[in-house]
Every structure is written in structure tokens, then in C-alpha cells.
Amino acid sequence: MNKISPEAEKVRNALLSKGIETPMITPEQDRDTRRAGIEQHMREVMKLIGLDLRDDSLEETPVRLAKMFVDEIFSGLDYANFPKITNIENRMKVSEMVLVNDVTLTSTCEHHFVTIDGMVSVAYYPKKWVIGLSKINRIVAFFAQRPQVQERLTEQILLAFQTILETDDVAVYVKATHFCVKCRGIKDTNSYTVTSAFGGVFLDDRETRKEFLTLINK
């Protein structure tokens, strides 16, 4: 396993302490070994559902799935992939709300391994630190790139920013479509799920919370 950054370690410990870390283990194998193992098992799965892997459209699918699982859609299970974060001292004494709206969210439902597709809004009131705006998108993407439930994902994003920015004054709002509802089971193509998490002034002050919700829904 690759070494993880101090920021990643702080965030992971915070999630573990609060009991909202994703249920996961640390694999003993390196990435190549894991990809090979997944490929082998996916070949068996595809055969069991009745697919002919001799077809040129299917023969490389197990390889593609293994690479996708390890290197892409579940890469957030490895804290070595946590975004590089450099806190910037708040020398300008920014005291107004910083809001990043409509951050693209693509995750995977941990119950059925199908897509969760939506948008995230993140806001905070700076104290000692600010961070680059793109880092907000990257942190959201990191926690999305793992099997998830939306409620836990929302809380993880909140606590990650509270930990990195060293402030409780953070708000997170997630609106997403779950393809486990859309393409199977009830097959509801219209519904979406909204979750939110508030800390500090967003939790304690109704007007601040109202301002945030008004801004993100304009």
C-alpha cells in the first residue's frame, strides 16, 4: 500500500472516531494482484449468467471491470488516492460564506453496485484556513469513488471539510438519482433523494441555514 498524506490520515481517523467510515478492510495484495483476482472471478460470474466470453465484444470485459473497480470507481477506498490538500492561511480575513454549488456526483450504490448520479453543494465560513475551490470537487469525488449509501456519503463529506478546514461551520447538500431504484425493483424514473448535513453556525442559526438553502436552489 502507498503511504497516505497527513491530511488523509486526519480525515480517516475523524471518520473512524465518529463511526461513519465506509465498512472496509485493507487488502494485503498489491493493485496488480487484486486486478488479476477480480478479473478471474468476473469471468466466472459472466459465465454463470450465461455469457459467452469467446465473443470478441465480451472477452476483455473482465479485464475492463477489474481495472474499473480498482483504479476508477472504487479508488476512494484507498486513502493513498486522497487529494493533495494545501491549506491557505486566511490572510484576507474572508468571513462571508464560501459556496461551491452543483458539484457533479457519480457514485455506486453499495447494495446493488449500480450508479448514484447527482449534485453536491458545499459551503463553509472560513476561520484560519481556506482551500482551493477545485479541492472541494476533488474531495467530493474521492468519497464518491467507493460503494456508498447517500446518507453516509453526506456525513463523510461534511466531516472531511470540518477536519481539513478546522471549523465546524460547514454545510453539505446532496441531491441524487439512484439507479437501484430507477432501473430495477420499483423502476421509478422520476424520484430523487435529498440529504443534508450541517455543522456549527449552519446547524445553530436558522437564518444562516436558510441563506444556504436559498442560494443553492436559485
Curated annotation (Swiss-Prot):
- Cellular component annotations (GO), alphabetically ordered: cytoplasm
Membrane-crossing segments per the record: none
Task: Give the record's GO biological process terms.
Answer: one-carbon metabolic process; tetrahydrobiopterin biosynthetic process; tetrahydrofolate biosynthetic process
**CDD domains attached here?**
GTP_cyclohydro1
Pathway involvement of the protein, from the record: Cofactor biosynthesis; 7,8-dihydroneopterin triphosphate biosynthesis; 7,8-dihydroneopterin triphosphate from GTP: step 1/1
- The UniProt record gives the binding positions of Zn(2+) as 109, 112, 180
Record-linked Gene3D superfamilies:
1.10.286.10, 3.30.1130.10
Could you tell me which SUPFAM superfamilies the record lists for this protein?
Tetrahydrobiopterin biosynthesis enzymes-like
Q: What family name appears in the similarity comment?
A: Belongs to the GTP cyclohydrolase I family.
PANTHER family according to UniProt? GTP CYCLOHYDROLASE 1, GTP CYCLOHYDROLASE I
Subunit note:
Toroid-shaped homodecamer, composed of two pentamers of five dimers.
Protein's name according to its UniProt entry: GTP cyclohydrolase 1
Q: Which organism is it from?
A: Pasteurella multocida (strain Pm70)
Q: Which gene encodes it?
A: folE
